[in-house]
Amino acid sequence: MKWTKLAAAVGLLTVFSVPQAMADKLDDIIASGVLRCAVVLDFPPMGSRDADNNPVGFDVDTCNDLAKALGVTAEIVETPFPERIPALISGRVDVGVASTSDTLERAKTVGFSIPYFAFTFNVVTRKDAGVDSYESLKGHKVGSTSGTYEAIRLEKDVTNWADPAGGFQAFQSQADVFLALSQGQIDGTAVTSTVAYATAADPNFSNLMVGGAAPYDIDYVSLITLRQEYGMINYLNLFVNQQVRTGRYKELFNKWIGPGEPPNLLIPGAYY
């Protein structure tokens, strides 16, 4: 009798514990009715603010599309580049729609979707800095946004150039980089092509120009969430797939970046 009662008790505990064990981030988001997206808002045309201070851009629309697919309301959480992963880990956001490069080092901490966008890179410099190519950055003070793919690559190249007249400085935001560049604190930076041409056309930075291509690999960027949230990662993968095959990816590209064909997200010889 005692064993029968014990078995029944264990069975009840198992039954009542299963829903809790199976609950995950995807369930939590749907239950809460809100999707909190980390978005970088000083990175046009991916993310910025309009004249009325409303968040706008490719990443903002992507977050809104994801929330719509989930049947919840989107909440844009402005997040500087260095804070994207900390915002996830601390629970301030549910996902990052923040142009995050899918590096193996970051994958130790967060989970990545398949790529939802891909970037090439250009130099941005001041018109009077004497820089007209990536190679001509050698011997100049340069800078980039801390924690980004281009910052890691640019700092590495400055170290390899070993020119005592040169140097690298990290900044907390893209806006800080362009302010320092326009004021003469640095002479150049490397940024995504989308940002480079948007900045050169910005009347607030009339003394800046595009200074040629940066010889970096294509930067594939992904949506991010906590690495253990397999259900959420699977959903994000299917969401990106749907964005492409329904034509929404191309539509957003032409709205914010184009006109033309958006970057190919297929990686030769890989499974996506």
PLM segments and residue spans:
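Short helices/loops that flank or line small-molecule/ion binding pockets
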Residues: K68-A69, V77-E78, P82-G96, T109-G111, ...
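Extracytoplasmic small-molecule ligand-binding "clamshell" domains
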Residues: A23-S99
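Ligand-binding cleft/hinge of the Venus flytrap
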Residues: C63-V72, E150-A170, A200-F205
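Periplasmic-binding protein-like
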Residues: L41, F117-T125, A201-L238, P259-Y272
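Flexible hinge/capping segments at coil-to-helix
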Residues: T125-V142
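Sec/Tat signal peptide C-region and signal peptidase I cleavage site
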Residues: S17-A23
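Beta->alpha turn/N-cap motifs
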Residues: A38-F43, V77-P82, G91-T103, F119, ...
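A ligand-binding cleft/hinge motif common to bilobed small-molecule-binding domains
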Residues: E83, T100-K108, R153-D157, S182, ...
